[in-house]
């Protein structure tokens, strides 16, 4: 559960007054990012299909929740627009929503391929288009942070359409950086490694956790807070000259 955010925000909060849209912000990495940004003074709108969790986290972060089915491109566009309009604009977009369906390439179906790309990549394009139009109209620039995966760089046997969909996220983010940089908009992707979210902790054995931890020179799995900390840097003015990058958050499992 994402902890409640205190209302005692200092003037030095790194994201004071910033308006943020977070897809997949009901739990996991997206939920942690939403909470971290809110704690730094941002106003956060969470987009997710998980209504109860989404409302709970929105209440905890002092933000708003918008139910969305990212498989539906029309609903994705209209819901993103509603979130932007509810805040009077958007300064930061975080695309964290994604799905992973385990299957071999030989057993991968067209439906699984299409649905994975629809949620992991196509919906990301839609939320960016809506948000960037608002950013350009406002004339103040903006920040785009897209969640990819280390699977985008190293693949993943048995992970179906997930690795290629995340590789597409990296390429899409670089295109965004190239096309929208002239408007003062930066775009970067994060490539997390093995992150122990609440859902992952409930479904993995200790043996799994120990094995995956051994892949990192640091000897542990990542936490959602590890990814949120890097996302906060990308959302802050400290990263204003950083764009088009695919940043590993893998504890050294991937070193390029």
Give residue spans per PLM region.
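Alpha-helical segment proximal to the catalytic Tyr-Lys
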Residues: 133, 178-179, 240
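Residue(s) in the substrate-gating loop at a strand-loop-helix junction
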Residues: 149
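Short, small/polar-rich loop/turn modules that mediate ligand/substrate recognition or access, typified
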Residues: 181, 186, 242-244
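Short C-terminal tail/terminal secondary-structure segment
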Residues: 2-12, 154, 232, 243-256
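Canonical Rossmann dinucleotide-binding motif of NAD(H)/NADP(H)-dependent dehydrogenases/reductases
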Residues: 13-44
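Active-site helix of classical SDR
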Residues: 128, 165, 173
């Amino acid at each position: 559960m994402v902890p409640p955010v205190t209302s005692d925000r200092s003037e030095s909060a790194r994201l004071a007054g910033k308006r943020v849209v977070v897809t997949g912000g009901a739990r996991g990495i997206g939920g942690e990012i939403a909470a971290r940004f809110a704690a730094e003074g941002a106003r956060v709108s969470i987009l997710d299909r998980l209504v109860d969790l989404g409302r709970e986290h929105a209440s905890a972060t002092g933000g708003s929740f918008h139910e969305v089915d990212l498989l539906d491109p029309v609903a994705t566009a209209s819901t993103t627009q509603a979130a932007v309009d509810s805040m009077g604009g958007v300064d930061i977009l975080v695309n964290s929503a994604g799905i992973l369906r385990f299957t071999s390439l030989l057993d991968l179906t067209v439906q699984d391929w299409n649905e994975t790309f629809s949620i992991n990549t196509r919906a990301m394009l839609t939320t960016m288009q809506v948000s960037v139009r608002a950013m350009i109209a406002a004339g103040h620039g903006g920040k785009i942070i897209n969640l990819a995966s280390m699977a985008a760089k190293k693949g993943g046997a048995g992970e179906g359409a997930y690795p290629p969909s995340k590789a597409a996220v990296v390429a899409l983010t670089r295109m965004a950086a190239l096309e929208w940089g002239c408007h003062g908009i930066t775009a970067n992707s994060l490539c997390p490694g093995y992150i122990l979210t609440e859902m992952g902790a409930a479904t993995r054995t200790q043996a799994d956790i120990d094995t995956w931890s051994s892949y990192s020179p640091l000897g542990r799995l990542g936490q959602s807070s590890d990814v949120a900390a890097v996302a906060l840097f990308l959302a802050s003015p400290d990263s204003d000259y950083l764009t088009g990058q695919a940043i590993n958050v893998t504890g050294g499992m991937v070193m390029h």
